[in-house]
């Protein structure tokens, strides 16, 4: 009876850890996107080049690095995958080079996040109809060697009509995979476990996660047990008749909250709501940074522990510039996300190409020194057109905006630790230290 009780307790402990992951661990993360849209063009291989920058990335207090899609792909960037086990066909480098890069990050205590593209797949061959729908896995024992029956039946351009209907948004450029098919679930789960056990990845970034249901994502997360998951659920803001974002974006952030709750475990989502509001707010509309309840207006206002904040990525910024942050205001975005709740994500370009490394590192150091984490307490002290001021954990105060005179908002026992054009960060200290010149 004692052994049975011990076994039961052990099972319950594992279940509890799955349902309520280590909050402290989740809250101390800084994610770094380690590539841009054109990284595949790097002579000598991106993996090899990035390996030389591991030390610089670690110096910013980064805990997780997001790496590009590692597999064979019809498109050089990796987002039109085909042979999923073939890591030597990647434009970023070979499998051996990838494993060496991951080992270098692990040696610095940084976990590696794979860009997982499984909503759709590109086939190697045509079937008898002349349709590209014969897939090759490039791996052991015919794994991931599929035919048209593994495609969603409503993707009529490629499917033979025998699969299930798509559980998410359509992806027109390639066959949408039937994620309700048991063989698909089993073999993709095996592949995800292989990425962790054989290649060394610790977590995932789920590309185009709107393409399949949260229930499907939950299945893969439960089967493969990554330590970190962040989903790309790119939802548009609501806009008023004047073309500007509406003041209320509750519907947008609710979609993100719903997804992470339905997936559970370590699942988080990129906070597209905060990005959209913030990049409008820094253009003379900082009043947007406080919602009707006095909280942050994005996902971090409702569920910060599960929100990954960012300024730009390979899609929104880089050379694609699909939804870019104003170029002259980028550092204001970092002043916000690196001192606020949520898990901040730093973009490669801004550190290594935009000459913002020193300022970003100073903000990241402030975050680490004061223990700011995903669940930190935020108090918005002011949100007006030309000034936003907030206190985090009663230890750090951030001011964004061109207004120089902030009145009596800043207590006398706070001193400046980071500042630049239109932003300033104060830190509480028992001993008042001299303020840098140019207090803002």
Curated annotation (Swiss-Prot):
Cofactor binding description: Binds 3 Ca(2+) ions per subunit.
Signal peptide (from-to): 1-26
Enzyme class: hydrolase
GO BP term (any one): starch catabolic process
Stretches that traverse the bilayer: none
Binding of Ca(2+) 2, residues: 145
A molecular function (GO) term: calcium ion binding
Binding site for Ca(2+) 1: 119, 166, 169, 176, 211
Key words, A-Z: Calcium, Carbohydrate metabolism, Glycosidase, Hydrolase, Metal-binding, Signal
Catalytic activity: Endohydrolysis of (1->4)-alpha-D-glucosidic linkages in polysaccharides containing three or more (1->4)-alpha-linked D-glucose units
Residue positions binding substrate: 72-74, 79-80, 205-210, 234, 236, 254, 295, 301-303, 314, 320, 399, 404-406, 416-422, 426
Catalytic site positions: 207, 232
Tissues where the protein occurs: Most abundant in embryo-derived callus tissue.
Binding residues annotated for Ca(2+) 3, in chain numbering: 155, 170-171, 174, 176
The family this protein is said to belong to: Belongs to the glycosyl hydrolase 13 family.
Function: Important for breakdown of endosperm starch during germination.
Subunit and partners: Monomer.
Protein's name according to its UniProt entry: Alpha-amylase isozyme 3A
